[in-house]
């Protein structure tokens, strides 16, 4: 029988306070998800432990029976929860497990060194103290069998009322009813010399029972359920009279270590299965207080959870009868070692025996993947016990490409603490298969309909979510022990992609994912003061194109047990339950009944020895009863209940004892006094299923239909109740009296009723839509109804843009979205209306066989294409209205095509490399050319540029006439227009007209060829003979600056001649340019335009026109003035030349004219000197030649006047007038040859310094040349002026530059007129001649000088 007062398991042979010590986690099945048991959980309850499945051992079966802590166990799938290691009791209702066979021994009672004087209560025999110890003065011991009075309260601290806490036994105090992890444990009566099962763990918290300090429980990182211990202090070990020592050699143990396959699937999984450690330990009497023994376990074993507040603790071993601590525990986590230190209990008692019954766990930290022959071992004292197991982790949950796995990995709970209810963590593996997922989303939800008392919660205020990306190829720990240092924290990337819902859920949007992710959910518990809360959390992964996949985790409770010897007093108790099926036997699903009074009498004396009231769960417990016969009576039954039959079946622990029964206490608790009661009400209902084969009979593979409405009516047709079928298709009307009822089933949408009453099994056939049910002293669960899905079909297909208007769907043609499509029946009634999606698809669903009419609305701006083109009805157009027939299958052939009634205009701009005006195959397009479209009124409609292939296109054009203008690309010239007969290949020029008439016009082309580029330049040379012609021996002048200007006078280029005197300007278009040569320092411009263009000098500035060819005729020459004359005068003359230099004066030529005079010729004076050498004859005549110099001066007429004698000479010298031509003056040089006097004249040359002045004033010299030499001397003084003139006055002496040429397109130089004289030197020479002639006249004839005009 089950005692629901303390959730303890009571047998006729004894009692175990399993409510105190044992809670278990079960593998829950939630919906279609496989909820793997994560890690263990304990909600702040005393010394409770959590494990995956509760252990059962046949050898301990008779000793104790434990009951689960889960008060709401009837709301969970107990088939999944209660999977024991050996047997499963069908009558277990709340995670009940049988443990151990305990044999009763009447001998070897404990011998106490000091007897304890009781104050009140019944007397109980106890053992005497060890023989070598003196008795206490208060002892009444007479011998080993001396009786001693011990009060019930001393023997067992709590009474019945004190056991209101699940775990803790406290004094009667309402404020102590809540769970407190630091209160004392319930004591048990176990013989010290005959403990076989030791099914209870008694934890000494060394604290006053009134201290409230709820335990914080934390789960390990591993998914394996691990032992959890409540918060407590290690019991202080009193110093012994002798030095403490290791007494492993004085400890003997009988130990079993068994791998428990909780779900019996022959697969050992750390997350679900566990190890059962049971040991009976005998302590040698030589052991003293302070001595210790050890329990060592392998690194593959996890003894308890990693609660940071409990890490150092493990349960002490106590005497369950009096609560005394036998040994205190200390855990060395680094070395997997538990050290138990004995208290003075071993000094006062002999033959101490202890029992350990632990569920310990496989450490997934050291077993990261599936592995065979994993060894587990535990060494108690000096005895090692081993076992092995093949570890096989479950695969991830996979559906198509979606995959997921999860586990609880940590939890801390504070039951009853509103401010800090605790927290828990769940680790989720997302896409561990590393598939490529589209629109992947993870939903985490702390809810499941089967677990309404779930205390998990998820919301943005209390939940923290971390997301880690797993490297490709990385192997995740199957035990969910995650090393985040090896992963990439991507939490920040997803903060804005986490959405919290109102139903304790969060959705993480991963988008497109092709790697695995680890999601760690850290959140707080909801506040609870429940003694049996549950935690369930689901995780669901969805992605586009794949079925979603779910997993989840649920937590329950268990506890490990240890115990030692105690006083022999016992308990009576068990359970009052509602026997819903009235069979007198406790069964799963039947609930306890509270507030029933239970009274116990000594059957021999009829004395009342105890009384209790059943708790809400129906349990009760009456403690402190010695061996004897007792009468148990139940009273105060709830109104309307009747007593179920008693003594049904062969199991006295599960049957009903009736209202009064006599039971016996004999050496152990008797937990068999139960009472079953029931309400005389009945149920009616059964099942609604999908009859897939339509045979009217429920077959094994046919499933229920959920959500079907079922109505219950009385015989008169009045509606009594309405229910809907559950997820399995079940329905039930409860609390019904005997009578006739009418049941009506509503046909679920999309289904058709199956055939009725097929076959002879009324529990398997279908009763149809309406049936009658009779209740007559029993439930009627035979009313079923079957349905099969009404066949439905789809009709639809595609609306597309038929760009080529051929009425057929081509692969490049796209759908048209938003087109309205209407479905009508044969009578023209509208059934459905839809619109095409973004791809042009549409579909009408849920249609039955029949003929339908489909109408397409022509989209705006489109025209229907031709209908029925081709033979493939799947790709042709059915027009805007068509008929579709459905006959036992979908019809996906109804299409409609449309096109836009607009056209395109354009074609091509190409580089016409051969300039023939026709597109040739090897000629390519020109990109980036601007093309403008105008209407007939010259209004710009559109502008485009040609693409990389030279193509252009104007789209969406109506019929009409258009003007197209092409902009000439930079560096190109339009080619010839309309060459050839092919309008698609020729060039339409820069402007053309295009006509659109119901078709595209793609014939408007324009060709261009690259505009030719030309070069300009030639040569600057040293004209050593000053003839203005390039001779083969004359060399180029380097570094002469040459500047190029465009027609606007803007500088477009500057260069310098190279070492050969060459220069060049490249990349020039046809056009007008100006070339300016910068005169080199110290050089004089040579004469220009003396010969053909490519050999002559063109002067300092040249205008040139380039037309379709290069021009390499632009040359210029310079020479260096000769300064070899002894006469400084010639220098002064050369000064005048230097003046002319600035304008590249041809004066130098005129100077060369006066070869007769060595004076003014700066360059050819040396010639005049040589001339003077050649002439020895009539100087006077030759002087007249010097007059002829005046001829070189255009003033020569006046000179000839001054020379009456030599007029004829001067006339002949008039040839020297040609000196003004600057070339013919060389003839006058020969004149000077006749002037051999010029030696003496050369003196006069020094006088003729005045000539240098006369340079500045070519006619002042004509004034009385013979005025006097002194005058001319003064002139020579003024010569110094001419010296200054040489550089600064050149402009004054030559107002127009001596040589400025303009070239026509043949580059022929034209002379420009001068306002001054080009032959200053020649004038000077003439002046000298005139002066000498005048002087001669004065001396010989006394004549005045002639005035030159």
Curated annotation (Swiss-Prot):
Residues 1-35 form the signal peptide. Keywords: Calcium, Cell wall, Peptidoglycan-anchor, Repeat, Secreted, Signal. Residues 130-145, 174-183 have a biased composition (Basic and acidic residues). Belongs to the serine-aspartate repeat-containing protein (SDr) family. It is found in: Secreted, Cell wall. A motif (YSIRK-G/S signaling motif) lies at residues 23-34. The modification Pentaglycyl murein peptidoglycan amidated threonine is found at residue 1315. GO terms for cellular component: extracellular region. Residues 1091-1101, 1118-1288 have a biased composition (Acidic residues). It is a peptidoglycan-anchor. SUPFAM superfamilies: Bacterial adhesins, Hypothetical protein PA1324. Residues 569-680, 681-791, 792-901, 902-1012, 1013-1123 form the CNA-B domain. Residues 62-71, 94-108, 146-155, 163-173, 860-869, 972-981 have a biased composition (Polar residues). This is Serine-aspartate repeat-containing protein D. The keyword Glycoprotein does not apply. Induction: Less protein is secreted in a secG mutant (at protein level). NCBIfam families: LPXTG_anchor, MSCRAMM_SdrD, YSIRK_signal. A motif (LPXTG sorting signal) lies at residues 1312-1316. Residues 54-185, 856-883, 972-992, 1081-1325 are annotated as: Disordered. Cell surface-associated calcium-binding protein which plays an important role in adhesion and pathogenesis. Mediates interactions with components of the extracellular matrix such as host DSG1 to promote bacterial adhesion to host cells. Contributes to the resistance to killing by innate immune components such as neutrophils present in blood and thus attenuates bacterial clearance. Residues 1316-1349 form a propeptide.
């Amino acid at each position: 029988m089950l005692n629901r007062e303390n959730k303890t398991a009571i047998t006729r042979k004894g009692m175990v306070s399993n409510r105190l010590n044992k809670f278990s986690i079960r593998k829950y099945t939630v919906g279609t998800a496989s909820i793997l048991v994560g890690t263990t959980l304990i909600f702040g309850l005393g010394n409770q432990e959590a494990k995956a499945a509760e252990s059962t051992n046949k050898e301990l079966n008779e000793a104790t029976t434990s009951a689960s802590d889960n008060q709401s166990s009837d709301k969970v799938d107990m088939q999944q929860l209660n999977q024991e290691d050996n047997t499963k009791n069908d009558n277990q209702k709340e995670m009940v497990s049988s443990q151990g066979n305990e044999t009763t021994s009447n001998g070897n009672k404990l011998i106490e060194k000091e007897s304890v004087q009781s104050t009140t209560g019944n007397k109980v025999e106890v053992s005497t103290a060890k023989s070598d110890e003196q008795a206490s003065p208060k002892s009444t011991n007479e011998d080993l069998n001396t009786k001693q009075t011990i009060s019930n309260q001393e023997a067992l601290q709590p009474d019945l009322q004190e056991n209101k806490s699940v775990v803790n036994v406290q004094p009667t105090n309402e404020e102590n009813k809540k769970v407190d992890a630091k209160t004392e444990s319930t004591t048990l009566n176990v013989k010290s010399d005959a403990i076989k099962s030791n099914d209870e763990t008694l934890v000494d918290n060394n604290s006053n029972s009134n201290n409230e300090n709820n335990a914080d429980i934390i789960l390990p990182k591993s998914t394996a359920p691990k032992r959890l211990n409540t918060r407590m202090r290690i019991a202080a070990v009193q110093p012994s009279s002798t030095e403490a020592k290791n007494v492993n050699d004085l400890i003997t143990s009988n130990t079993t270590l068994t791998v428990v396959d909780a779900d019996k699937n022959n697969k050992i999984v750390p997350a679900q299965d566990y190890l059962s450690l049971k040991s009976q330990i005998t302590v040698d009497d030589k052991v003293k207080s302070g001595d210790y023994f050890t329990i060592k376990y392998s690194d593959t074993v996890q003894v308890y959870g990693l609660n940071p507040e409990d890490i150092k603790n493990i349960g002490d071993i106590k005497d369950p009868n009096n609560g005394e601590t036998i040994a205190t525990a200390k855990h060395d986590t680094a070395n997997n070692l538990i050290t138990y230190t004995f208290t003075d209990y071993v000094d006062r008692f002999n033959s101490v025996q202890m029992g350990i019954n632990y569920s310990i766990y496989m450490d997934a930290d050291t077993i990261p993947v599936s592995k065979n022959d994993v060894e587990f071992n535990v060494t108690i004292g000096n005895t090692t016990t081993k076992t092995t197991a093949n570890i096989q982790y479950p695969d991830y949950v996979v559906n198509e490409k979606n995959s997921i796995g999860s586990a609880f990995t940590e939890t801390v709970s504070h039951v009853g603490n509103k401010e800090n209810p605790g927290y828990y963590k769940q680790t989720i593996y997302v896409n561990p298969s590393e598939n490529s997922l589209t629109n992947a989303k993870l939903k985490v939800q702390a809810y499941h309909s089967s677990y309404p008392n779930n205390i998990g919660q998820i919301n943005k205020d209390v939940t923290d979510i971390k997301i880690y990306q797993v490297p490709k190829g990385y192997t995740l720990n199957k035990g969910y022990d995650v090393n985040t240092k090896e992963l990439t924290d991507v939490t920040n990337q997803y903060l804005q992609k986490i959405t919290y819902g109102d139903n304790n859920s969060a959705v993480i949007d991963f988008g497109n994912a092709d790697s695995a992710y680890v999601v760690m959910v850290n959140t707080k518990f909801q506040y609870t003061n429940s003694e049996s809360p549950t935690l369930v959390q689901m995780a669901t992964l969805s992605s586009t194109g794949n079925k979603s996949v779910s997993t989840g985790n649920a937590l329950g409770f268990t506890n490990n047990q240890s115990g030692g010897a105690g006083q022999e007093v016992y308990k009576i108790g068990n359970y009052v339950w509602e026997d819903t099926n009235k069979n007198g036997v406790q069964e799963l699903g039947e609930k306890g009944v509270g507030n029933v009074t239970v009274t116990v009498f000594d059957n021999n004396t009829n004395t009342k020895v105890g009384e209790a009231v059943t708790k809400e769960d129906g349990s009760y417990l009456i403690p402190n009863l010695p061996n004897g016969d007792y009468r148990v009576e139940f009273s105060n039954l709830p109104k309307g209940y009747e007593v179920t039959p008693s003594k049904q079946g062969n199991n006295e622990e599960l049957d009903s004892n009736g209202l009064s029964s006599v039971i016996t206490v004999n050496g152990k608790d008797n937990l068999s006094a139960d009472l079953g009661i029931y309400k005389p009400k009945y149920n009616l209902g059964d099942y609604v299923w999908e009859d897939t084969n339509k045979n009217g009979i429920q077959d094994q593979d046919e499933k229920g239909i959920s959500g079907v409405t079922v109505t219950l009516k009385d015989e008169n047709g009045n509606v009594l109740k309405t229910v809907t079928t559950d997820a399995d298709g079940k329905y039930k009307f409860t609390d019904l009296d005997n009578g006739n009822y009418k049941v009506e089933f509503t046909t679920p949408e999309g289904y058709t009723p199956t055939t009725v009453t097929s076959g002879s099994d009324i529990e398997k056939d279908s009763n149809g839509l309406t049936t009658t049910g009779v209740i007559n002293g029993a439930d009627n669960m035979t009313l079923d109804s079957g349905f099969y899905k009404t066949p439905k079909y789809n009709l639809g297909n595609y609306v597309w843009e038929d760009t080529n208007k051929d009425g057929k769907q081509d692969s490049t043609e796209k759908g048209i979205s938003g087109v309205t499509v209407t479905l009508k029946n044969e009578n023209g009634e509208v059934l459905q209306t839809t619109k095409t999606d973004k791809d042009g698809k549409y579909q009408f669903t849920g249609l039955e066989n029949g003929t339908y009419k489909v109408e397409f609305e022509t989209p705006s701006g489109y025209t229907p294409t031709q209908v029925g083109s081709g033979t493939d009805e799947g790709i042709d157009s059915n027009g805007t209205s068509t008929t579709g027939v459905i006959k036992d299958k979908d019809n996906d052939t109804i299409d409609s095509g449309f096109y836009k009634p607009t056209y395109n205009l354009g074609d091509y701009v190409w580089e016409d490399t051969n300039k023939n005006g026709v597109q040739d195959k090897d000629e390519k397009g020109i990109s980036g050319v601007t093309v403008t479209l105008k209407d007939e009124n010259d209004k710009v409609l559109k502008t485009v540029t040609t693409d990389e292939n030279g193509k252009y296109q104007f789209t969406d054009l109506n019929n009409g006439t258009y003007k197209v203008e092409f902009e000439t690309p930079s560096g190109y010239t339009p080619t010839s227009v309309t060459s050839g007969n092919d309008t698609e290949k020729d060039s339409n020029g820069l402007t053309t007209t295009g006509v659109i008439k119901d078709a595209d016009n793609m014939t408007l082309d324009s060709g261009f060829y690259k505009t030719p580029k030309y070069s300009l330049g030639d040569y600057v040379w040293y004209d050593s003979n000053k003839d203005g012609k390039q001779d083969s021996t004359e060399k180029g002048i380097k570094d002469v600056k040459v500047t190029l200007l465009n027609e606007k006078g803007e500088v477009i280029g500057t260069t310098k001649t190279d070492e050969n005197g060459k220069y060049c300007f490249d990349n020039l278009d046809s056009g007008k340019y100006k070339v300016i040569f910068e005169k080199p320092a110290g050089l004089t411009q040579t004469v220009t335009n003396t010969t053909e263009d490519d050999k002559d000098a063109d002067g300092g500035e040249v205008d040139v026109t380039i037309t379709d060819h290069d021009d390499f005729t632009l040359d210029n020459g310079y020479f260096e003035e000769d300064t070899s004359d002894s006469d400084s005068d010639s220098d002064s003359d050369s000064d005048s030349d230097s003046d002319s230099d600035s304008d590249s004066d041809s004066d130098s030529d005129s100077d060369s004219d006066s070869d007769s005079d060595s004076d003014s010729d700066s360059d050819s004076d040396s010639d005049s000197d040589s001339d003077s050498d050649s002439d020895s004859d009539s100087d006077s005549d030759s002087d007249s030649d010097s007059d002829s110099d005046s001829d070189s001066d255009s003033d020569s007429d006046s000179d000839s006047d001054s020379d009456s004698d030599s007029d004829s000479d001067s006339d002949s010298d008039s040839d020297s007038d040609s000196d003004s031509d600057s070339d013919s003056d060389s003839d006058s040089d020969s004149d000077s040859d006749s002037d051999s006097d010029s030696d003496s004249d050369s003196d006069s040359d020094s006088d003729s310094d005045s000539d240098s002045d006369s340079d500045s004033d070519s006619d002042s010299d004509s004034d009385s040349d013979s005025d006097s030499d002194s005058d001319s001397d003064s002139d020579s003084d003024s010569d110094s002026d001419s010296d200054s003139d040489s550089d600064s006055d050149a402009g004054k002496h030559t107002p127009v530059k001596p040589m400025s040429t303009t070239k026509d397109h043949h580059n022929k130089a034209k002379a420009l007129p001068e306002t001054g004289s080009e032959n200053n030197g020649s004038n000077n020479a003439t002046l000298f001649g005139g002066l000498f002639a005048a002087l001669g006249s004065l001396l010989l004839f006394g004549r005045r000088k002639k005035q030159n005009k």
